[in-house]
Design a protein with these regions (language model features):
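N-terminal small-domain helix-loop-helix segment of the aminotransferase-like
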Residues: 29-134, 140-169, 176, 360-363, ...
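Conserved PLP-binding catalytic core of the aspartate aminotransferase-like
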Residues: 72-73, 371-375, 384-416, 432, ...
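PLP-dependent enzyme catalytic core of the Aspartate aminotransferase-like
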Residues: 111-115, 227, 361, 408-421, ...
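Conserved PLP-anchoring active-site segment centered on the Schiff-base-forming lysine
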Residues: 163, 180-201
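Active-site pre-lysine segment of PLP-dependent enzymes
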Residues: 199, 203, 210, 220-233, ...
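Conserved core segment of the aminotransferase class I/II
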Residues: 299-371, 375-378, 454
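Conserved small-domain helix->loop->beta segment predominantly found in fold-type I
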Residues: 345-350, 364-367, 375-401, 422-428, ...
Length: 468
């Protein structure tokens, strides 16, 4: 904290906190913000603690693995585009545009996505397949006779500029969509483990977060818990794959089951349930399997996308909201989302980086950089005796704390100047999140600390020459 706040109101009226005048001790803050300050952001708090320790001991003596701040340099396409676009006509470059963003940028994004779909970069669900399951099961021959649906769909270019709304990252896209569809007391399903920011985004609309349990070492969805918790107030579900913090990539079979449950519940409660696919890590997948394209599995899907992680430009805050035509009331959603962009004060996404992003759509994420860090960290943790699953995507590793006491583990780590984030922030007490997107030297410097911690917890005996 940069300044002390006296935020307790118990037993006091407004303006009567221990003799202080009205306006002190957070009395002028809204109740929602006051509670947010008390709880704070675990990720930001850890990051700021790392900055404080770095100022005391030197950055090379602090091992900050808390935040997803990529150390891989932005691709050359980004730097080249910045130089070229900076020379464009200043008036057109820096002026307002329509709320949804520059049309030529949205056209470039939609055309790029269409091209990737056409090339088969994503795994598509066969619409005739799931229609057959709902109708009681048709043979593959019957499906092929009905027009070879898959071939037609893959040739079709499903997206246009009208489906795209430029935003300040995926977080901005989510806030735009939430304001568009949520009323107070509506319910939003979040799948454990989940990004902590969802709590604030949902709270901005006075809606309610409903946590859904996961199961197994691979953090798969507990479908019985999901089905039990969907009510008439359920408006949408957030899916994050590859997942932050676990690195899990949900399989096609998982998505089919999820889609079937959502359709079943839609019929029961009498209205649509939107699935918001949060995709800042779409390009960061370490398996050879194609990443499922979620709108092809469930028609009421919208996508919040960010260029931050894949192109190493998190501070530029650029992304988009994609609303496919198949989504229920898609026309109204698009109109509402444009309105929400202005009403939230965004007005429009960053003009300069809209154009930079459009010019860099062919740039590739530095997967080799992250994979090298991951392999180094994962192998060392296993050899030290820790229990963790190798992530399939994103750039985080979710480590189980040996005795389940995450706060004590975090404090012990901090005593060695190792900064991590507790699993409670992600809805999963007893874990810690480790970011491996930083510099390799930081990862290497952290490994002896993990070995010391393993010794302290008695999960690994010291071997001569192994630890320092």
């Amino acid at each position: 904290m940069l300044f002390p706040l006296c935020l307790s109101r118990r037993g006091k009226k407004r303006g009567e906190v221990e003799g202080r005048s009205r306006g002190e001790c957070g009395e002028m803050l809204s109740e929602r913000v006051r509670k947010s300050l008390i709880k704070g952001s675990a990720i930001r708090r850890a990051f700021e603690e790392g900055q404080r320790l770095a100022a005391l001991y030197g950055a090379d003596k602090v091992y900050d693995l808390s935040i997803g701040n990529p150390a891989a340099p932005a691709p050359e396409e980004i730097r080249r585009a910045m130089r070229e676009i900076a020379e464009e006509d200043a008036l057109s470059l820096h002026s307002y545009m329509e709320d949804a963003g520059f049309r030529e940028v949205r056209e470039a994004i939609s055309e790029n996505l269409n091209e990737r779909l056409r090339k088969g970069e994503f795994l598509l669900e066969r619409r005739d397949d799931y229609a057959a399951r709902e109708e009681g099961g048709k043979s593959r021959e019957e499906q092929e006779k009905q027009g070879r649906t898959r071939e037609k769909e893959e040739r079709r270019l499903p997206f246009t500029a009208e489906n795209v709304i430029m935003s300040h990252g995926a977080a901005g896209a989510m806030n735009i969509f939430f304001r568009t569809v949520l009323d107070p007391d509506d319910e939003v399903m979040v799948l454990k483990p989940y990004y902590p920011g969802y709590t604030s985004f949902i709270g901005n609309c006075y809606a309610k977060k409903v946590e859904v349990d996961c199961q197994g070492e691979d953090f798969q969805i507990d479908f019985s818990d999901l089905e039990r918790k969907i009510t008439v107030r359920t408006k949408l579900l957030i899916l994050n794959s590859p997942n932050n913090p676990s690195g899990t990539v949900y399989t096609a079979e998982t998505l089919r089951t999820l889609a079937e449950i959502l359709r079943k519940k839609e019929r029961e409660i009498g209205h649509s349930i939107y699935l918001l696919s949060d995709e800042p890590y779409r390009e960061l997948c370490y398996t050879r399997e194609r990443l499922p394209f979620i709108p092809s599995f469930y028609e009421n899907t919208v996508i919040a996308y960010s260029f931050s992680k894949s192109l190493s430009i998190p501070g530029e805050r650029i992304g988009y909201l994609l609303i496919p035509a198949e989504a229920e009331e898609s026309g109204e959603l698009l109109l509402g989302a444009r309105n929400s962009t202005g009403a939230l004060g965004f007005v429009n996404a960053n003009a300069f980086f809209q154009k930079v992003a459009a010019a860099s759509l062919q740039a590739k994420a530095p997967l080799a950089y992250y994979r090298e860090n991951l392999d180094l960290l994962y192998q060392a943790l296993l050899e030290s005796g820790f229990s963790c699953r190798k992530p399939e995507g994103a750039f985080y590793l979710f480590l189980r704390v040996p005795d389940g006491e995450e706060e004590r583990f975090l404090e012990r780590a901090k005593a060695h100047r190792l900064i991590l984030v507790g699993g409670s922030a992600f809805g999963m007490p007893g874990f810690v999140r480790i970011s491996f997107c930083g510099k390799k030297e930081t990862i290497e410097g952290a490994l002896p600390v993990f070995r010391r911690l393993a010794l302290e917890y008695g999960i690994r005996k010291e071997a001569s020459g192994t630890y320092r």
